[in-house]
Design a protein with these regions (language model features):
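N-terminal edge beta-strand
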Residues: 24-50, 192-213, 339-370
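Short, conserved beta-strand segments of beta-strand-rich sandwich/propeller modules, principally
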Residues: 55, 97, 107-109, 217, ...
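Extracytoplasmic beta-sandwich strand-turn segments characteristic of Greek-key/jelly-roll folds
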Residues: 41-48, 70-104, 201-208, 238-273, ...
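Extended terminal and domain-junction accessory segments
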Residues: 2-16, 119, 124-168, 249-381, ...
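Short, hydrophobic/aromatic beta-strand segments
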Residues: 28-30, 64-71, 111, 227-234, ...
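Extracytoplasmic/lumenal soluble domains of exported proteins with redox or metal-associated functions
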Residues: 2-110, 114-119, 124-125, 130-131, ...
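Acidic-aromatic/histidine active-site loop/patch
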Residues: 145-214, 221-224, 339, 344-354
Length: 450
């Protein structure tokens, strides 16, 4: 029997989202079932002006409550889309309106913020994500084409194989590495057999068609629930101009972009190598399983080429500047540790010795300047996300920098990062690892304003 349509109220919304089951054809004879917005993966591009009041009407056509998180936006707790902050759910077969002012300008995104736990058909394991662009007068310069590329994997499953996708370099600093390794065996982790950029596996969709001499503005988003990816555009370089939607002080050309769940990278690419090329994952197994797209110059018909990069290192700090940081009002040390789950269990995570949920909260005073020091005492890399605020990177593994503003930062295995932030968004504020399994099993904390 058909359910009644939930009733809308008030004026027409600026944007409408419908959460519902859908089928996605990743490639011929490769069709997967997921949950998505408006039967599309990614969901519809939301484009708005900075400072614009926005109303988004969300209809939930599933049997479970849902939350839509406006990632990277400076919005009140009650609309941020996190249950832990007190945002109301979009009820099953009901609707909810999110109303906020669009800020700050830049590449943002929206996605499910529902806990999945052991159900790999919920939360960020699904196709519930989309790009959100907030335009301002400060544009990235002239470009001929704008492209949105979301990185995804599909059909997740639990495995005993270590899924930390950031290949450790033996020369990397490990300031947080313990003298004695933990002898306990790891628990089950999440892997996936299928990969795509947007909704197509490599070679299955239309190529990205370009012309020699064009400047292409690429918006890259890692919409994965579990994996860090390293992206290469064969024969070309990325001129990185923004991280997490925020312009960098020193744009730089790089051969590889390392991007963790939740992160965005904006880059200009000069089309100066006519041919047919592959833009895709550095790791052969991920690229051959679908993570890539063909880029085809006009009047070029040959087989797509893949060329590995000469340099494969990624370093946030090259995009920063040298400048002193104002002294913080308070320094908060945050120590992250893993409790291994064993071969048939799940790893659990501690923040300062506590697994979420717990009674301990970190406290901000409005207007205060805080220095957060992230100590990663685990053998996994973690993309750490602060809701409703931006922070500035101060140092990474002892390498200083300034001017790089983000909302999500990778802290490497046994590594350390320091960020500065101003407490200027009153209300409960969620902090967590953006790997869904880590978040679900303890890697979260709440900040509240005094």
């Amino acid at each position: 029997m058909a359910r009644p349509e939930p009733k809308a109220t008030g004026r027409a919304a600026d944007f409408n989202l419908r959460i519902a089951p859908t089928m996605v054809e990743l490639a011929p004879q490769v069709v997967i079932s997921t949950i998505a917005y408006n039967n599309k993966v990614p969901g519809p591009l939301m484009r708005m002006r900075e400072g614009q009041p926005v109303t988004v009407e969300v209809v939930n056509d599933t049997d479970v409550p849902e939350y839509v998180h406006w990632h990277g936006l400076l919005v009140p707790s009650e609309v941020d889309g996190a249950q832990e902050e007190g945002t109301p759910a979009v009820p099953p077969h009901g609707r909810r309106r999110y109303q906020f002012v669009a800020k700050p300008a830049g590449s943002r995104w929206y996605h499910s913020h529902t806990a999945a736990m052991m159900d790999l058909r919920r939360g960020s394991y699904t196709g519930q994500f989309g790009f959100l662009m907030i335009d301002s007068a400060n544009d990235p310069g002239t470009y001929d084409q704008e492209v949105f590329l979301a990185l995804r994997e599909w059909e997740p499953y639990l495995t005993t194989t270590d899924q930390d996708e950031q290949a450790a370099d033996p020369n990397d600093p490990t300031p947080e590495k313990p003298a004695t390794p933990d002898p306990r065996p790891n628990g089950l982790e999440v892997s996936a057999p299928l990969y795509s950029i947007n909704d197509k596996m490599l070679g299955a969709g239309e190529p990205l068609r370009v012309q020699s001499g064009q400047r292409i503005l690429m918006h890259l988003l890692n919409a994965s629930a579990s994996q860090i990816h390293r992206i290469v555009f064969s024969g070309h370089r990325f001129q990185v101009i923004a991280l997490d939607g925020n312009p960098v002080p020193a744009p730089q050309p790089v051969e590889i972009i390392e991007i963790a769940p939740g992160e965005r990278v904006d880059a200009i690419v000069e089309m100066n190598q006519p041919g047919v090329w592959i833009l895709g994952e550095l790791r052969d197994v991920a690229r051959r399983s679908g993570m890539g797209i063909v880029v085809e110059y006009a009047n070029q018909q040959q087989r797509a080429q893949w060329l590995p990069p000469k340099k494969s290192r990624w370093d946030y700090t090259i995009f920063g500047k040298t400048a002193p940081h104002p002294a913080p009002d308070q320094t908060i040390d945050m120590v992250f540790e893993k409790v291994p789950g064993g071969p048939h269990g799940i790893n659990h995570w501690l923040v300062n010795g506590k697994e979420y949920p717990h009674e301990r909260e970190f406290v901000f005073r409005q207007g205060g300047r805080y220095r957060l020091v992230f100590h990663n005492r685990s053998d996994d890399s973690h993309p750490l996300h602060m809701h409703r605020h931006l922070f500035e990177l101060v140092e990474l593994n002892g390498k200083p920098t300034a001017g790089i503003k983000k909302d999500t930062v990778i802290v490497p295995a046994f590594g350390r990062a320091t960020v500065d932030m101003v407490a200027d968004q009153p209300g409960l504020t969620l902090f967590h690892c953006h790997i869904q399994q880590h978040m679900d099993f303890g890697f979260m904390a709440l900040f509240r304003y005094a």
